């Protein structure tokens, strides 16, 4: 992966135009000419990796509660589009398998954020194993695995020495030991929060040899500033507004 390339990641797909983390949002990215998306992955009770941000169904579907006891067959009864608008009614929660198929068909690349599974270590390890297994089916598209849970990323690296890793940080936990964390993870990227990020920090990250992909950037002015500083990518809810920055 060329760390010098300036990338715009469609955050949860084009989540300002379509329901987040749905195939409609990912397809919108392709229609707009974007080459990278960001999405979130967690796991159902039967071991199926699904694309969803929250640990409950409440915010982004017509259902409620945890999905940790559900199975793949239950997805047919869950509407992940109506909350966004009536024109999106019936949009399902996608599986990671569906996304991998879509990536192979379109050439779309993805940053996949591993969610910090709340059901315990066993399901967390199962999530990692299932995700890595699905990614073996990729035929061409690039992928980055990221997480705020750096223990999960260490588990990823222990299982796979090659998959690119991006360590996510909120500004409150971006301590001076960031380099030690990245080295222990054998990570290729650091994903810092835009708020509080300075040019000097970006210079340090880049000088250490890491890709710097910043979240979440929704104005052309901030995007241009960050790219001028040398960041390699930005995550945006409105990527279509940044294409002609």
Q: What is each stretch, according to the model?
A:
Residues 1-245:
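Phosphate-group recognition and catalysis centered on beta-loop-alpha active-site segments
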């Amino acid at each position: 992966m060329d760390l010098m390339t300036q990338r715009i990641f469609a955050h949860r797909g084009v989540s300002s135009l379509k329901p987040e983390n749905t195939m409609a949002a990912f397809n919108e990215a392709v229609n707009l000419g974007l080459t990278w998306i960001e999405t979130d992955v967690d796991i159902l009770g039967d071991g199926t990796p699904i694309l969803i941000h929250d640990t409950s169904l409440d915010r982004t579907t017509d259902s409620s509660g945890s999905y940790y006891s559900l199975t793949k067959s239950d997805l047919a009864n869950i509407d992940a589009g109506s909350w966004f608008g009536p024109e999106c009614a019936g949009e399902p929660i996608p599986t990671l398998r569906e996304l991998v198929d879509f990536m192979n068909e379109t050439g779309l690349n993805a940053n996949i954020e591993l969610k910090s599974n709340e059901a315990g270590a066993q399901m967390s390890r199962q999530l990692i194993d299932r995700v890595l297994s699905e990614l073996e089916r990729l035929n061409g598209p690039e992928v980055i695995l990221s997480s705020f849970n750096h223990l999960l990323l260490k588990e990823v690296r222990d299982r796979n020495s090659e998959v690119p890793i991006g360590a996510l940080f909120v500004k409150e936990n971006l301590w001076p030991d960031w380099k030690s964390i990245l080295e222990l993870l054998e990570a290729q990227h650091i994903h810092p929060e835009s708020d509080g990020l300075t040019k000097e920090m970006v210079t340090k990250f880049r000088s250490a040899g890491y890709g710097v992909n910043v979240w979440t950037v929704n104005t052309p002015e901030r995007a241009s500033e960050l790219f001028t500083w040398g960041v390699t990518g930005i995550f945006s809810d409105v990527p279509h507004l940044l294409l002609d920055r």
